[in-house]
């Protein structure tokens, strides 16, 4: 018996006034995939992310996590369902250290239940032990993302690429089932993009599932297992990267007539 999809979205709909931003969008992401979501500017990609991560309430559709109904109506429910995301514009705590940023993510995962208010005030043994575990886990994630040497550096002093990696480390600290990345390669040079690709492949190979929005078509096609293409809020193609690149509607709407060459 086959396992249910990690995330299944059916007929998702979102309307802003008279604008239909998502027009019955459906997709299914299997565990262990890197899944790409692409399309022209204004196609509905970020709106879709905002719906499945609880920032926008959907106006229609059904959502499932591993076959169970999922209502993305609030950010805390999204975290409980096992979805973590990054944003197109970096949203770190700029004046905190890299280590502290990741520890914040870990605190979200543990909900602070190991300490309680009085434990934090009195710095009880349980509080101190919990903090030590969180700190150790955060160090391990920074090492995993290749930025362990910057643990004590202030986040805003890191390079752009390393700030992106720090965002991913913080998201991974919540131990998500699905890691949703909104344009993680934005602003990166070619070397940084190659490093990002290797990092995401490692995360996938270690058992995580990734959903990625990205404008760099070459990166998406070389990285993703499956790709969905949106245009004006509608799905116009879905399949393997090779299938999507050959789809005439995709070529016309997004990739350009030379996309299948070179």
Where are these regions (language model features)?
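Glycine-rich phosphate-binding loops of nucleotide-dependent enzymes
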Residues: 2-262
């Amino acid at each position: 018996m086959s396992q249910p999809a990690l995330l299944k979205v059916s007929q998702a709909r979102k309307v802003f006034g008279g604008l239909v931003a998502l027009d019955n969008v459906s997709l299914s992401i299997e565990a262990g995939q890197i899944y790409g979501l692409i399309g022209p500017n204004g196609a509905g990609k970020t709106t879709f992310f905002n719906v499945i991560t609880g920032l926008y309430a959907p106006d229609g559709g059904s959502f499932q996590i591993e076959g169970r109904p999922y209502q993305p109506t609030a950010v805390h429910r999204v975290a409980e369902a096992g979805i973590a995301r990054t944003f197109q514009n970096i949203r770190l705590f700029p004046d905190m250290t890299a280590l502290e940023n990741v520890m914040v993510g870990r605190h979200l995962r543990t909900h602070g239940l190991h300490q309680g208010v009085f434990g934090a005030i009195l710095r009880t043994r349980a509080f101190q032990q919990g903090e030590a575990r969180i700190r150790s886990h955060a160090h391990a994630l920074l090492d995993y993302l290749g930025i362990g040497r910057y643990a004590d550096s202030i986040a805003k002093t890191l390079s752009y690429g390393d700030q992106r990696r720090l965002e991913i480390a913080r998201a991974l600290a919540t131990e998500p089932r699905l890691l949703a990345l909104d344009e993680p390669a934005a602003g990166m040079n070619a070397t940084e993009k190659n490093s990002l690709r290797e990092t995401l492949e490692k995360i996938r190979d270690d058992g995580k599932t990734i959903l990625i929005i990205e404008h760099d078509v070459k990166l998406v096609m070389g990285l993703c297992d499956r790709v969905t293409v949106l245009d004006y809020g509608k799905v116009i193609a879905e399949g393997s990267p090779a299938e999507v690149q050959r789809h005439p509607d995709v070529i016309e709407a997004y990739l350009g007539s030379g996309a299948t060459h070179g």
